[in-house]
């Protein structure tokens, strides 16, 4: 059985474009993001650009002010840290719901662990972010609960992880071993798996 390709709306595509610009450093903290310029660049109307910017504002990545337009927020460690207790709670629930499924089959997690070993070896921060987030997304997806996955995605995990590394330098030398240990814990049906996942996520939080 083949999986149907995911079709992203125009708004989602624009949001991803802006997110990539923030993560890559195209737009620096405090820098203005011009709605009209993005619309021209992507050859779209300003309406979906405005909708995408609203979503990013709800994630606290940008801020708007009357007569000043939209700017990238100057995020602090405290700002970034706030999402981690919520994320840890969600992933602990996901670990409990997914425990039996992942005990039998961890194939969705294993490629990310292998990729993390390679990213660690190369000190590839971009790869570390991509596969750390990919690992945790597959963990949450394995819970089989669409509300849980939607809520987790709504936290902006990937962009906050990337920004904490880019702006705050919260990079670790090794990401792979901790994630391999979680795979081993799922395989052995560790009764404390939810606590292990929660502690792991909280341990990744930037410190104010």
Predicted regions span which residues?
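Amphipathic alpha-helical segments enriched in hydrophobic/aromatic residues interleaved with Lys/Arg
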Residues: 106-123
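Hydrophobic, amphipathic alpha-helical faces that serve as interaction scaffolds
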Residues: 86-99, 133-170
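Short linear motifs at protein or domain termini
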Residues: 1-100, 205-208
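Mobile beta-alpha loop/short-helix "lid" or hinge segments that flank ligand
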Residues: 58-63, 155-157, 172-173
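Hydrophobic packing residues in well-ordered alpha-helices of helical domains and bundles
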Residues: 83, 106-109, 128, 132, ...
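Generic detection of well-ordered alpha-helical segments
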Residues: 8, 12, 16, 20, ...
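C-terminal all-alpha effector/ligand-binding and dimerization domain
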Residues: 113, 117, 164-208
């Amino acid at each position: 059985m083949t999986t149907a390709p995911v079709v992203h709306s125009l708004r989602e595509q624009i949001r991803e474009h802006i997110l990539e610009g923030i993560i890559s450093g195209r737009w620096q903290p405090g820098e203005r993001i011009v709605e009209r310029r993005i619309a021209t660049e992507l050859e779209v109307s300003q309406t979906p650009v405005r909708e995408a910017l609203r979503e990013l504002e709800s994630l606290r990545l940008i801020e708007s002010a009357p007569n000043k337009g939209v700017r990238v927020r100057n995020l602090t460690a405290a700002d970034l840290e706030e999402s981690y207790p919520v994320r840890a709670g969600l992933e602990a629930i996901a670990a409990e719901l997914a425990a039996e499924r992942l005990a039998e089959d961890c194939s969705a997690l294993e490629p990310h662990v292998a990729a993390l070993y390679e990213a660690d070896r190369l000190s590839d921060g971009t790869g570390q972010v991509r596969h750390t987030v990919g690992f945790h997304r597959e963990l949450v997806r394995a819970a089989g609960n669409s509300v849980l996955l939607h809520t987790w995605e709504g936290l902006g995990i990937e962009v906050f992880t990337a920004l904490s590394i880019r702006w705050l330098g919260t990079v670790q030398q090794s990401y792979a071993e901790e994630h391999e240990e979680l795979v081993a814990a799922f395989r052995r049906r560790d009764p404390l798996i939810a606590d292990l996942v929660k502690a792991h996520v909280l341990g990744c939080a930037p410190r104010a």
